[in-house]
Amino acid sequence: MDVSYYDGPKDEVIEAMLKSAVTAMKLGQYEDGKGRLEDTMEFGTSNFQLLGTIYMYYGRVCRHLNHDAKALEFFEHELNMFKLIFNYPEACDSTRRIVQQALKMEKFSKARRFAEDLIDYTSNKKNGEKYIGQARILFASVCLEGCERDVESNQDEKKKLLSICAEQIAAVKLFNENNTEGAVSETKIMLIEAKCLSLDEKYEESRRKYQECIDFAIKTDQFEAVHIAYYDKALYAETYLLFFIIRDLRSALFYATKFGKERDVVKYKSKLSEEMLRNGEFHEAYLYGLEALVSIRKLGLNEHIGDVLLTIAKCLIALGKRRQAAYFIILGSVLTINQSSFKLFYEQIDVAMNQERSETATDQDACLAIDSSPDPTSSNDMINKFVVKLEHATNVETWEMIVNGIIEDQKKPVAIEKKENEEPVDMMDLIFSMSSRMDDQRTELSAARFIPPRPVSSASKKTTKSHRILPGLRANWTKVQSMKFDGHTMNRILKRSKKSKSSLDSTNSIQGDDTRSDDVTMTSK
């Protein structure tokens, strides 16, 4: 490995820069946080642990900004860095992030390969054996995900995935019996086992296992596991009776509200709204859906918004409030214009217009003037003033043309109408008005003002071969000679670096996501 003499800035400087980037992320300023992390990598460091942490945050911010390919790339850099220095706990966490990102990008084979690699990595290293239980649980969850998503069209292959999952669960149980250090949580094992039974259509056994998990989690004060167990039980084990599904979802929502994260509450409200709609409880379903919509906008969980808008629209149609339903249908249609779910919104506007036509006198035109009053955050004048006519819903192609027209109208600049008999503006009044506005702006400082400025240094211009092998790496030969590395990982990094050059400026793959599954926290390394 070719390294340079220059060691880069001291760790304290890099840590301060990293902290500045994380602060920006906490404030929701993800583009700025991304830029600060890129500056940090341009400065570079020879601290492998610190560099791995930088990669982790850069992957997270890319994931939040929907730069999925770049996020996956830097999670892989993170994993390689921690494998190099035999940091097994961080390697497990890195692999988990890679698996989640790969599954999100529908790269099941890649997720499976990394999960299997983690088992090999931990089982072949003396100090890594205590983490093999975590590796096996991760591999089991990947197999279940593949089975659930029908990545294998062949039924025999699906059975094989479930068989692998069962084998991994048995191996983890055996590991727990023989090891106290590194033992996997019993609730985690029971959740995986119950889901495996459900996907294998052993529903009665699955329900018993979920209930066993719930009882054990309550007894041991693991309340976060309780809401997960109730939700999974509703999703996988209660296959036919809506009463039991809704009951379990209510329990999941109760525990998530008290002990879970906001995104869990949103997910459960959204699902509860769907199931109550199926059960004919339209108004309560509508209220849960509206609450979920407000939280989705607040948290930026855009991956759920289409489903919630569709559920709300269906509820309002069932309640006979077609003008309000039309508003949410248009919102959903605009958001899903290039997606397969667009057709679902067309089907609802078709239902609403057919109902409106049946209740309209034959000598009058059937139309729906939009009513956005149920939406507390509505500020779209273009949609609010729109009137849906019967001919708009002739077919899905016609509706697509109408929605595209709305989108194009929204892009046009708003014309400023000149008021009649408008008096000329006095110059002194204008000066005093501008001065007053400037005073107001001085007293309302944005949160960004309190973030340290992004530093600039000539050090960032000094690029080394080690920096090109891994972004931000400025290795000092004296320091490297005294360190022990994982040879297999090092050889793989060097081999990959010959085939392609990693760059912060390479093209990103833009896909839909949500990204706040991990809390943004600063960890001192």
From Swiss-Prot:
Recorded phenotype for the gene knockout or disruption: Simultaneous RNAi-mediated knockdown of both gpr-1 and gpr-2 causes, in the 1-cell embryo, a decrease in nuclear and spindle movements during prophase, reduced asymmetric spindle elongation during anaphase and mispositioning of nuclei after cell division.
Disulfide bridge partners, by residue number: none
GO molecular function, one term: GDP-dissociation inhibitor activity
Example GO BP: cell division
InterPro entries: GoLoco_motif (IPR003109), TPR-like_helical_dom_sf (IPR011990)
Assigned keywords, A-Z: Cell cycle, Cell division, Cytoplasm, Cytoskeleton, Mitosis
Region of interest: Disordered: 489-525
Classification via Gene3D superfamilies: Tetratricopeptide repeat domain (1.25.40.10)
Cellular component terms per the entry's GO annotation: aster; cell cortex; mitotic spindle
Subcellular location: Cytoplasm, Cell cortex; Cytoplasm, Cytoskeleton, Spindle
SMART domains (alphabetical): GoLoco
Domain GoLoco: 424-445
Summary of subunit composition and partner proteins: Interacts with gpr-1; gpr-1 forms a complex with lin-5 and GDP-bound goa-1.
Function as written in the Swiss-Prot or TrEMBL entry: In the 1-cell embryo, probably together with gpr-1, controls nuclear rotation and spindle elongation during mitosis. Complex of gpr-1 and gpr-2, in association with lin-5, activates G-protein signaling to affect mitotic spindle force. Polarity determinants (par genes) may regulate lin-5/gpr-1/gpr-2/goa-1 locally to create the asymmetric forces that drive spindle movement.
Protein name listed in UniProt: G-protein regulator 2
Gene designation: gpr-2
